[in-house]
Protein backbone atom coordinates (compact mmCIF):
# COMPACT_ATOMS: atom_id res chain seq x y z
CA UNK A 1 0.00 0.00 0.00
CA UNK A 2 1.37 3.40 -1.01
CA UNK A 3 2.10 5.94 1.69
CA UNK A 4 -0.84 8.38 2.03
CA UNK A 5 1.47 11.39 2.22
CA UNK A 6 2.73 10.60 -1.27
CA UNK A 7 -0.60 9.97 -3.02
CA UNK A 8 -3.24 12.17 -1.33
CA UNK A 9 -3.68 15.35 -3.46
CA UNK A 10 -3.52 17.74 -0.47
CA UNK A 11 -1.14 15.86 1.81
CA UNK A 12 1.43 15.36 -0.97
CA UNK A 13 1.77 19.16 -1.35
CA UNK A 14 2.57 19.41 2.38
CA UNK A 15 4.87 16.40 2.02
CA UNK A 16 6.84 17.95 -0.83
CA UNK A 17 7.12 21.28 1.06
CA UNK A 18 7.86 20.19 4.63
CA UNK A 19 8.84 16.51 4.75
CA UNK A 20 10.52 15.12 1.61
CA UNK A 21 11.80 18.51 0.46
CA UNK A 22 15.46 18.16 -0.65
CA UNK A 23 17.45 20.77 1.30
CA UNK A 24 21.17 21.66 1.19
CA UNK A 25 23.14 19.83 3.88
CA UNK A 26 25.01 22.93 5.05
CA UNK A 27 22.35 25.61 5.66
CA UNK A 28 22.95 27.39 8.97
CA UNK A 29 20.59 28.83 11.58
CA UNK A 30 20.25 31.94 9.38
CA UNK A 31 17.86 29.79 7.31
CA UNK A 32 15.53 29.36 10.31
CA UNK A 33 13.84 32.73 9.91
CA UNK A 34 11.43 31.68 7.16
CA UNK A 35 9.72 29.20 9.47
CA UNK A 36 9.89 31.69 12.38
CA UNK A 37 8.12 34.28 10.21
CA UNK A 38 5.43 31.69 9.46
CA UNK A 39 4.97 31.09 13.20
CA UNK A 40 4.84 34.87 13.81
CA UNK A 41 2.19 35.31 11.12
CA UNK A 42 0.00 32.51 12.52
CA UNK A 43 0.39 33.93 16.06
CA UNK A 44 -0.53 37.43 14.85
CA UNK A 45 -3.60 36.19 12.95
CA UNK A 46 -4.85 34.15 15.94
CA UNK A 47 -4.24 36.81 18.61
CA UNK A 48 -5.64 39.46 16.25
CA UNK A 49 -8.78 37.40 15.69
CA UNK A 50 -9.43 37.18 19.44
CA UNK A 51 -8.75 40.91 19.86
CA UNK A 52 -11.17 41.72 17.02
CA UNK A 53 -13.91 39.87 18.94
CA UNK A 54 -13.78 42.56 21.64
CA UNK A 55 -12.49 45.64 19.79
CA UNK A 56 -14.78 48.38 18.46
CA UNK A 57 -13.56 50.57 15.59
CA UNK A 58 -15.29 53.75 16.68
CA UNK A 59 -13.43 56.90 17.78
CA UNK A 60 -15.59 57.17 20.90
CA UNK A 61 -15.06 53.59 22.11
CA UNK A 62 -11.83 52.28 20.49
CA UNK A 63 -9.53 53.33 23.35
CA UNK A 64 -11.90 52.08 26.06
CA UNK A 65 -12.46 48.79 24.19
CA UNK A 66 -8.69 48.14 24.34
CA UNK A 67 -8.77 49.01 28.06
CA UNK A 68 -11.72 46.62 28.45
CA UNK A 69 -9.72 43.84 26.72
CA UNK A 70 -6.81 44.36 29.13
CA UNK A 71 -8.92 44.62 32.29
CA UNK A 72 -12.06 42.51 31.85
CA UNK A 73 -11.48 39.86 29.17
CA UNK A 74 -9.99 36.56 30.38
CA UNK A 75 -6.27 36.75 29.57
CA UNK A 76 -7.08 39.77 27.39
CA UNK A 77 -3.91 41.52 28.58
CA UNK A 78 -1.89 38.49 27.44
CA UNK A 79 -3.54 38.39 24.00
CA UNK A 80 -3.09 42.14 23.53
CA UNK A 81 0.59 42.15 24.54
CA UNK A 82 1.33 38.99 22.54
CA UNK A 83 -0.12 40.78 19.51
CA UNK A 84 1.76 44.05 20.12
CA UNK A 85 5.12 42.45 20.91
CA UNK A 86 4.54 39.69 18.35
CA UNK A 87 4.70 42.48 15.74
CA UNK A 88 8.14 43.43 17.07
CA UNK A 89 9.31 39.81 16.87
CA UNK A 90 7.88 39.64 13.35
CA UNK A 91 9.99 42.61 12.27
CA UNK A 92 13.13 41.35 14.04
CA UNK A 93 12.78 38.08 12.10
CA UNK A 94 11.99 39.99 8.88
CA UNK A 95 15.09 42.19 9.13
CA UNK A 96 17.31 39.19 9.92
CA UNK A 97 15.72 37.23 7.04
CA UNK A 98 16.37 40.08 4.57
CA UNK A 99 19.88 40.57 5.98
CA UNK A 100 20.59 36.87 5.44
CA UNK A 101 19.36 37.21 1.83
CA UNK A 102 21.71 40.16 1.25
CA UNK A 103 24.74 38.50 2.84
CA UNK A 104 24.46 35.13 1.11
CA UNK A 105 23.21 36.39 -2.27
CA UNK A 106 19.76 34.80 -2.01
CA UNK A 107 18.47 37.78 -4.02
CA UNK A 108 19.66 36.00 -7.17
CA UNK A 109 16.40 34.03 -7.02
CA UNK A 110 14.57 36.98 -8.59
CA UNK A 111 10.93 35.87 -8.27
CA UNK A 112 11.34 34.81 -4.64
CA UNK A 113 13.18 38.05 -3.81
CA UNK A 114 10.61 40.32 -5.49
CA UNK A 115 7.68 38.57 -3.79
CA UNK A 116 9.65 39.02 -0.56
CA UNK A 117 9.85 42.80 -1.14
CA UNK A 118 6.07 42.86 -1.76
CA UNK A 119 5.62 40.93 1.49
CA UNK A 120 7.78 43.45 3.35
CA UNK A 121 5.66 46.35 2.08
CA UNK A 122 2.43 44.49 2.94
CA UNK A 123 3.61 43.68 6.49
CA UNK A 124 4.72 47.29 7.02
CA UNK A 125 1.32 48.56 5.85
CA UNK A 126 -0.43 46.10 8.17
CA UNK A 127 1.70 47.12 11.16
CA UNK A 128 1.16 50.83 10.50
CA UNK A 129 -2.63 50.43 10.37
CA UNK A 130 -2.59 48.22 13.46
CA UNK A 131 -0.74 50.93 15.39
CA UNK A 132 -3.61 53.36 14.66
CA UNK A 133 -6.32 51.09 16.11
CA UNK A 134 -5.84 51.62 19.91
CA UNK A 135 -6.62 55.32 19.23
CA UNK A 136 -4.07 56.72 21.64
CA UNK A 137 -2.20 59.98 21.07
CA UNK A 138 0.62 58.37 19.06
CA UNK A 139 -1.93 56.33 17.06
CA UNK A 140 -3.83 59.44 16.02
CA UNK A 141 -0.85 61.68 15.31
CA UNK A 142 1.14 58.90 13.64
CA UNK A 143 -1.80 58.29 11.31
CA UNK A 144 -2.15 62.03 10.63
CA UNK A 145 1.55 62.58 9.87
CA UNK A 146 2.12 59.46 7.73
CA UNK A 147 -1.08 59.68 5.66
CA UNK A 148 -0.45 63.41 5.20
CA UNK A 149 2.80 62.54 3.38
CA UNK A 150 0.71 61.49 0.39
CA UNK A 151 -0.28 65.14 -0.07
CA UNK A 152 3.25 65.64 -1.45
CA UNK A 153 2.22 63.77 -4.61
CA UNK A 154 1.81 66.44 -7.30
CA UNK A 155 -1.69 67.39 -8.49
CA UNK A 156 -3.69 64.53 -6.89
CA UNK A 157 -2.03 64.60 -3.44
CA UNK A 158 -4.62 66.57 -1.44
CA UNK A 159 -7.58 64.72 -2.97
CA UNK A 160 -5.87 61.39 -2.33
CA UNK A 161 -5.28 62.17 1.36
CA UNK A 162 -8.89 63.28 1.90
CA UNK A 163 -10.07 60.15 0.08
CA UNK A 164 -8.00 57.93 2.40
CA UNK A 165 -9.16 59.86 5.47
CA UNK A 166 -12.82 59.74 4.39
CA UNK A 167 -13.12 63.39 5.42
CA UNK A 168 -11.00 66.45 6.15
CA UNK A 169 -9.04 64.88 9.01
CA UNK A 170 -8.25 61.50 10.59
CA UNK A 171 -11.59 60.55 12.16
CA UNK A 172 -14.16 57.75 12.56
CA UNK A 173 -14.17 56.89 8.83
CA UNK A 174 -10.37 56.55 8.86
CA UNK A 175 -10.35 54.31 11.94
CA UNK A 176 -13.08 52.03 10.54
CA UNK A 177 -11.36 51.53 7.19
CA UNK A 178 -7.96 51.01 8.84
CA UNK A 179 -9.52 48.28 10.99
CA UNK A 180 -11.01 46.64 7.88
CA UNK A 181 -7.66 46.76 6.05
CA UNK A 182 -5.73 45.64 9.12
CA UNK A 183 -8.03 42.61 9.35
CA UNK A 184 -7.77 41.57 5.69
CA UNK A 185 -4.08 42.30 4.96
CA UNK A 186 -2.57 39.46 7.06
CA UNK A 187 -4.53 36.95 4.96
CA UNK A 188 -3.13 38.57 1.81
CA UNK A 189 0.32 38.32 3.45
CA UNK A 190 -0.31 34.60 4.10
CA UNK A 191 -1.28 34.08 0.43
CA UNK A 192 1.83 35.97 -0.74
CA UNK A 193 3.96 33.86 1.64
CA UNK A 194 2.54 30.77 -0.12
CA UNK A 195 3.62 32.20 -3.50
CA UNK A 196 7.02 33.11 -1.97
CA UNK A 197 7.48 29.44 -0.97
CA UNK A 198 6.18 28.22 -4.34
CA UNK A 199 8.89 30.20 -6.16
CA UNK A 200 11.55 29.15 -3.63
CA UNK A 201 10.75 25.46 -4.13
CA UNK A 202 11.14 25.91 -7.90
CA UNK A 203 14.85 26.60 -7.42
CA UNK A 204 15.56 25.07 -4.00
CA UNK A 205 17.24 26.89 -1.11
CA UNK A 206 20.48 28.79 -1.40
CA UNK A 207 23.26 27.86 1.06
CA UNK A 208 26.07 29.74 2.88
CA UNK A 209 28.71 28.92 0.24
CA UNK A 210 26.51 30.22 -2.58
CA UNK A 211 27.43 27.15 -4.65
CA UNK A 212 25.03 24.72 -6.32
CA UNK A 213 24.06 22.08 -3.75
CA UNK A 214 22.23 19.60 -6.02
CA UNK A 215 24.91 16.97 -5.42
CA UNK A 216 24.46 17.08 -1.65
CA UNK A 217 20.83 17.29 -0.50
CA UNK A 218 19.20 15.88 2.62
CA UNK A 219 15.46 15.51 3.43
CA UNK A 220 13.91 18.46 5.27
CA UNK A 221 12.39 16.11 7.86
CA UNK A 222 13.82 15.20 10.39
CA UNK A 223 16.99 17.32 9.96
CA UNK A 224 15.54 20.79 9.51
CA UNK A 225 12.19 20.24 11.24
CA UNK A 226 14.04 19.66 14.52
CA UNK A 227 16.34 22.61 13.80
CA UNK A 228 13.31 24.85 13.13
CA UNK A 229 11.61 23.66 16.34
CA UNK A 230 14.71 24.72 18.32
CA UNK A 231 14.63 28.15 16.65
CA UNK A 232 10.90 28.44 17.39
CA UNK A 233 11.46 27.57 21.07
CA UNK A 234 14.15 30.26 21.37
CA UNK A 235 11.87 32.84 19.73
CA UNK A 236 8.88 31.86 21.90
CA UNK A 237 11.10 32.16 25.00
CA UNK A 238 12.20 35.69 24.00
CA UNK A 239 8.63 36.74 23.13
CA UNK A 240 7.21 35.28 26.36
CA UNK A 241 9.87 37.04 28.44
CA UNK A 242 9.09 40.33 26.71
CA UNK A 243 5.31 39.94 27.12
CA UNK A 244 5.39 38.78 30.75
CA UNK A 245 8.19 40.95 32.16
CA UNK A 246 8.27 44.22 30.20
CA UNK A 247 5.34 44.34 27.76
CA UNK A 248 5.54 48.12 27.27
CA UNK A 249 9.30 48.30 26.69
CA UNK A 250 8.96 48.74 22.91
CA UNK A 251 5.77 50.82 22.98
CA UNK A 252 5.29 54.56 23.39
CA UNK A 253 3.93 55.86 26.73
CA UNK A 254 1.98 58.55 24.79
CA UNK A 255 -0.29 55.82 23.45
CA UNK A 256 -1.78 55.41 26.94
CA UNK A 257 -3.28 58.89 26.53
CA UNK A 258 -6.56 58.85 24.52
CA UNK A 259 -6.31 60.54 21.10
CA UNK A 260 -6.80 64.30 21.27
CA UNK A 261 -6.78 66.26 17.97
CA UNK A 262 -6.26 69.51 19.93
CA UNK A 263 -3.04 68.42 21.66
CA UNK A 264 0.05 67.44 19.66
CA UNK A 265 2.62 65.20 21.43
CA UNK A 266 6.11 66.79 21.68
CA UNK A 267 7.76 64.04 19.58
CA UNK A 268 5.65 62.18 17.02
CA UNK A 269 7.39 58.94 16.13
CA UNK A 270 6.32 55.53 14.78
CA UNK A 271 7.08 52.11 16.30
CA UNK A 272 10.79 51.23 16.57
CA UNK A 273 10.79 49.05 13.43
CA UNK A 274 9.92 52.04 11.21
CA UNK A 275 12.41 54.46 12.76
CA UNK A 276 15.17 53.87 10.18
CA UNK A 277 12.80 54.81 7.32
CA UNK A 278 11.40 57.70 9.38
CA UNK A 279 14.93 59.05 9.90
CA UNK A 280 15.56 58.92 6.13
CA UNK A 281 12.24 60.73 5.56
CA UNK A 282 13.15 63.49 8.04
CA UNK A 283 16.68 63.95 6.74
CA UNK A 284 15.41 65.55 3.51
CA UNK A 285 14.02 69.10 3.97
CA UNK A 286 11.71 68.80 0.92
CA UNK A 287 8.38 67.00 1.49
CA UNK A 288 8.17 65.15 -1.85
CA UNK A 289 11.89 64.32 -1.71
CA UNK A 290 11.44 62.89 1.77
CA UNK A 291 8.51 60.71 0.68
CA UNK A 292 10.48 59.40 -2.32
CA UNK A 293 13.49 58.63 -0.09
CA UNK A 294 11.17 56.85 2.38
CA UNK A 295 9.76 54.57 -0.35
CA UNK A 296 13.17 54.06 -1.95
CA UNK A 297 14.73 53.03 1.38
CA UNK A 298 12.78 49.76 1.01
CA UNK A 299 12.27 49.65 -2.78
CA UNK A 300 16.06 49.84 -3.25
CA UNK A 301 16.07 46.12 -2.38
CA UNK A 302 14.58 45.49 -5.84
CA UNK A 303 17.69 46.82 -7.63
CA UNK A 304 20.19 44.85 -5.54
CA UNK A 305 20.19 41.83 -7.94
CA UNK A 306 21.04 44.24 -10.80
CA UNK A 307 23.96 45.63 -8.80
CA UNK A 308 25.49 42.20 -8.14
CA UNK A 309 28.85 42.54 -9.88
CA UNK A 310 30.73 39.84 -7.92
CA UNK A 311 31.78 36.54 -9.47
CA UNK A 312 30.81 34.76 -6.26
CA UNK A 313 27.22 34.68 -5.10
CA UNK A 314 27.74 34.68 -1.34
CA UNK A 315 29.80 37.09 0.80
CA UNK A 316 31.22 34.09 2.68
CA UNK A 317 34.59 34.34 0.88
CA UNK A 318 34.56 38.13 0.23
CA UNK A 319 36.06 39.90 3.28
CA UNK A 320 35.82 43.43 1.83
CA UNK A 321 32.12 43.03 1.05
CA UNK A 322 31.60 41.53 4.51
CA UNK A 323 33.08 44.68 6.05
CA UNK A 324 30.74 46.88 4.00
CA UNK A 325 27.75 44.71 4.90
CA UNK A 326 28.38 45.20 8.62
CA UNK A 327 28.94 48.94 8.07
CA UNK A 328 25.48 48.95 6.42
CA UNK A 329 24.01 47.17 9.47
CA UNK A 330 25.65 49.73 11.79
CA UNK A 331 24.31 52.52 9.57
CA UNK A 332 20.75 51.14 9.83
CA UNK A 333 21.09 50.93 13.62
CA UNK A 334 22.28 54.57 13.63
CA UNK A 335 19.24 55.56 11.52
CA UNK A 336 16.95 53.68 13.94
CA UNK A 337 18.45 55.61 16.86
CA UNK A 338 18.17 58.97 15.02
CA UNK A 339 14.53 58.30 14.08
CA UNK A 340 13.63 58.27 17.77
CA UNK A 341 15.45 61.54 18.55
CA UNK A 342 14.01 65.09 18.35
CA UNK A 343 14.68 67.19 15.23
CA UNK A 344 17.58 69.29 16.54
CA UNK A 345 21.35 69.60 16.29
CA UNK A 346 23.36 67.28 16.13
CA UNK A 347 20.73 64.61 15.34
CA UNK A 348 19.67 66.25 12.05
CA UNK A 349 23.22 66.18 10.64
CA UNK A 350 23.87 62.62 11.87
CA UNK A 351 20.60 61.51 10.22
CA UNK A 352 21.51 63.18 6.92
CA UNK A 353 24.99 61.61 6.91
CA UNK A 354 23.58 58.18 7.77
CA UNK A 355 20.94 58.48 5.01
CA UNK A 356 23.55 59.42 2.38
CA UNK A 357 25.78 56.57 3.62
CA UNK A 358 22.88 54.09 3.31
CA UNK A 359 22.14 54.85 -0.34
CA UNK A 360 25.81 55.33 -1.34
CA UNK A 361 26.83 52.00 0.18
CA UNK A 362 24.14 50.04 -1.65
CA UNK A 363 24.21 51.84 -5.02
CA UNK A 364 27.90 52.62 -5.39
CA UNK A 365 30.42 51.37 -2.86
CA UNK A 366 29.32 47.71 -2.61
CA UNK A 367 29.14 47.05 -6.41
CA UNK A 368 32.55 48.73 -6.94
CA UNK A 369 34.07 46.73 -4.07
CA UNK A 370 32.74 43.51 -5.64
CA UNK A 371 34.50 44.42 -8.90
CA UNK A 372 37.75 45.05 -7.00
CA UNK A 373 37.37 41.62 -5.35
CA UNK A 374 36.92 40.06 -8.81
CA UNK A 375 40.30 41.50 -9.81
CA UNK A 376 41.90 40.23 -6.59
CA UNK A 377 40.79 36.70 -7.52
CA UNK A 378 43.25 36.81 -10.43
CA UNK A 379 46.27 37.36 -8.18
From Swiss-Prot:
The keyword Iron applies. The keyword Transmembrane applies. The chain crosses the membrane at residues 33-53, 77-98, 113-133, 178-198, 226-246, 288-308, 320-340, 347-367. A ubiquinone binds at residue 201. One of its GO terms (cellular component) is respiratory chain complex III. GO terms for biological process: mitochondrial electron transport, ubiquinol to cytochrome c. One of its GO terms (molecular function) is metal ion binding. Pfam families: Cytochrom_B_C, Cytochrome_B. Keywords: Electron transport, Heme, Iron, Membrane, Metal-binding, Mitochondrion, Mitochondrion inner membrane, Respiratory chain, Transmembrane, Transmembrane helix, Transport, Ubiquinone. Heme b b566 binds at residues 97, 196. Disulfide bonds: none annotated. Its cofactor is heme b. Component of the ubiquinol-cytochrome c reductase complex (complex III or cytochrome b-c1 complex) that is part of the mitochondrial respiratory chain. The b-c1 complex mediates electron transfer from ubiquinol to cytochrome c. Contributes to the generation of a proton gradient across the mitochondrial membrane that is then used for ATP synthesis. Belongs to the cytochrome b family. Heme 1 (or BL or b562) is low-potential and absorbs at about 562 nm, and heme 2 (or BH or b566) is high-potential and absorbs at about 566 nm. PANTHER family: CYTOCHROME B. This is Cytochrome b. The gene is MT-CYB.
Amino acid sequence: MNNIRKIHPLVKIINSSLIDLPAPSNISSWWNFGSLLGICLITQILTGLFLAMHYTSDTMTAFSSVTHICRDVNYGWLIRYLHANGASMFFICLFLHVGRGLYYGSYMYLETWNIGILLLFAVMATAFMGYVLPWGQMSFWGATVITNLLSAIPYIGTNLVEWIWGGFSVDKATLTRFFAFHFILPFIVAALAGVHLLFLHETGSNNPSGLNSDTDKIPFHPYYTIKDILGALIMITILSSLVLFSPDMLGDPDNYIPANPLNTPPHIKPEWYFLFAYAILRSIPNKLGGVLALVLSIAILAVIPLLHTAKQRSMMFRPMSQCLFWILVADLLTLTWIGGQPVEHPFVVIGQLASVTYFTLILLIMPITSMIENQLLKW
